[in-house]
Design a protein with these regions (language model features):
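Functional transmembrane helices that form membrane-embedded active or gating regions
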Residues: 46-57, 278-280, 333-361, 403-415
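Short, positively charged low-complexity motifs
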Residues: 3-6, 19-23
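Specific transmembrane alpha-helix
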Residues: 106-121, 158-170, 245-268, 317-337
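Long hydrophobic alpha-helical segments that form multi-pass transmembrane helix bundles
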Residues: 185-262
Length: 417
């Protein structure tokens, strides 16, 4: 008999008996039938592949965010700026640049775009008259949460995502190919501007005040804290670039996420051959590009003269690497459903709670318990592993008892009020 849990029935299984085989694909197959009270939740099953991708992305994001918790911002981009005193520190920094930087945030942004479409579609199925307005209200709440979050850490992405969300809503029904093309343009376009911006800076990283641009901008800060530990601000030129770059990469990946969802790629139910092709092709293109960009910086001893243009290879690598990761994760989701899979998926289902928890732990441990800038990358990596273990341990038991994470529950109550 089906069991009632939190106002909905679950656990009903239909099993077709084993037979002699033939061509019937249903023989020996067990189906989980989710029976939910119609007024409680939409008749939509969670897509396990999305939860798994989101969980892995969130864990990977911490690998980069922890650098900004424990070290000055310059160390995030410039490995020689701080935190790389030993060969192990440096090796960890190179690994993160190649495998994590931009890629994990790209995965996370991609899934955020998908979640916007999922919410609107689910609201329509439930009979909401204004599903788009519901999504706008939800993202306004996320923006408010992001403002509060940014008071403690200036690397918050919730505000950025909330700003991009209305554009995703406007374009969500566009053709997938158009969304992909526009998304690629938004991701790659801002990075190409570095070809114009890099000549504005002198070899010492200061702004060339003889140029028309510098005379109009007039702050004279140069690369600022993007590249130098001793600087406390980005400066107008670098700040404007990162504003455009962050908006472009976030919105671009969201639109690509909508396209991949419409193309039935993110569900994880394409053939294994398809996902193998995506994984191999994406990683063979993306990882060498990231390696070239990182190698360029290392061999130049992180020269000021390539501080901005060196971003181009890694940006070009983002989309193919993200697709490669999606291929690998989808293969895992379809072939192996072990305890690790279950616990990482639980992290993905509680992404907002776990994202905010990472910040709380990062600020408390890496800035209060230990003074910022006193730890190396290898020591910060131990913090990352600790938080991973904590979130792997607590997320699944929480969801066994409750339907949502604590922050997800609060957000849900507010936007469905």
């Amino acid at each position: 008999m089906p069991r009632w849990r939190n106002g909905r029935r679950s656990g009903l299984k239909i099993r077709f008996p084993y037979g002699s085989g033939g061509s019937n694909p249903f023989l020996g197959t067990t189906f989980d039938v989710i029976l939910e009270a119609p007024l409680m939740n939409p008749l939509v099953r969670r897509i396990s592949n999305l939860d798994l991708i989101r969980g892995i992305a969130l864990l990977g994001i911490l690998g980069m965010n922890a650098i900004s918790f424990g070290l000055p911002w310059a160390a995030y981009w410039n490995l020689s700026a701080a935190g790389s005193e030993t060969w192990l520190d440096f090796a960890i920094g190179v690994f993160c640049e190649i495998f994590l930087d931009q890629k994990m945030m790209g995965l996370f942004s991609l899934l955020f775009g998908t979640s916007i479409v999922l919410l609107v579609d689910a609201a329509k199925e439930r009979g909401y008259r204004r599903p788009v307005l519901l999504s706008v209200w939800r993202n306004l709440l996320l923006f408010i949460i992001g403002i509060i979050h940014s008071l403690f850490w200036d690397g918050d992405v919730l505000r950025l995502y909330a700003i991009c969300a209305p554009i995703v809503l406007l374009l969500r029904n566009s053709r997938p190919r158009l969304l992909v093309a526009f998304g690629i343009f938004l991701v790659v376009g801002p990075a190409t501007l570095t070809l114009l911006l890099q000549p504005l800076f002198l070899s010492d990283g200061s702004l060339d005040m003889t140029t028309n641009w510098a005379m109009n901008v007039g702050d004279g800060i140069g690369l600022g804290k993007y590249w130098f530990v001793e600087s406390s601000t980005f400066g107008a030129t670098v700040g404007l670039f990162f504003l455009l770059d962050n908006l472009g990469r976030a919105l671009g990946m969201m639109l690509i996420g909508v396209a991949l969802y419409r193309m039935n790629i993110l569900h994880g139910n394409r053939s294994l051959r398809f996902y193998r092709l995506v994984a191999i092709t994406g990683l063979l293109i993306g990882l060498p590009l990231s390696s070239i960009g990182t190698g360029w910086l290392v061999t130049s001893d992180f020269a000021n003269t390539i501080a901005l243009v060196s971003l181009i290879p890694n940006t070009l690598a983002t989309i193919p690497t993200v697709l490669g990761y999606i291929g690998l994760i989808s293969i895992w989701d379809s072939k192996v459903k072990n305890r690790l899979h279950t616990h990482i998926s639980a992290i993905g289902r509680m992404a907002l709670s776990n994202y905010l928890l990472q910040t709380v732990l990062g600020i408390v441990i890496l800035r209060v318990v230990f003074e910022q800038g006193t730890l190396g990358r290898s020591q910060i990596a131990l913090f990352v592993i600790f938080v991973w273990a904590l979130q792997l341990i607590w997320s699944k038991p929480w969801l066994d008892k409750f339907s949502y994470g604590p922050c997800e529950w609060i957000l849900r109550k507010l936007y469905r009020w």
